[in-house]
Amino acid sequence: MPSYKLIYFNMRGRAEIIRYIFAYLDIKYEDHRIEQADWPEIKPTLPFGKIPILEVDGLNLHQSLAIARYLAKNTDLAGKTELEQCQVDAIVDTLDDFMSRFPWAEKKQDIKEQMFNELLIYDAPHLLQDLDTYLGEKEWFIGNSRFDRGIVIRKIYSHIQWKSLICGKYISRSMVDA
């Protein structure tokens, strides 16, 4: 078993999907958290100056979704066929497109809150309805893959602080808690 060290800020953010995968697969890893005050000194030492970084036996991997795909590739999380893998990638990329629209770096709290609220009120319900429609009556999003609604939906909900605005009205609570 390789040795894993995940390097990210002391927050959920882009490393959270990696942590979910480690937890789901019961893989032990070092969760190295960087404080914001230390970032200016650390940034120039990293590939492309970005995190998260996953060290695998000393080799640095970067880009959160590439890392997630690497970890999921040899499990049932990534899909069993190339077609299923493409479907998994499409769902993950759809969620990433949505999450990338949030103003995470906005410094002005009132503007940040307004932008968050607009995305949650106007856009999140459509995304969640699309995911609900895509899932339909199936148990899984993709084939019989364990890449299930829990991992997908929790990825979004872990970032949405105001989930009560949409939970229950646009997607059933049981799907979130599954």
Could you tell me what each predicted segment is?
Residues 88, 141-178:
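GST superfamily/GST-like fold recognition
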Residues 1-128, 132, 137-141, 165:
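GST-like domain detector, emphasizing the conserved glutathione-binding G-site
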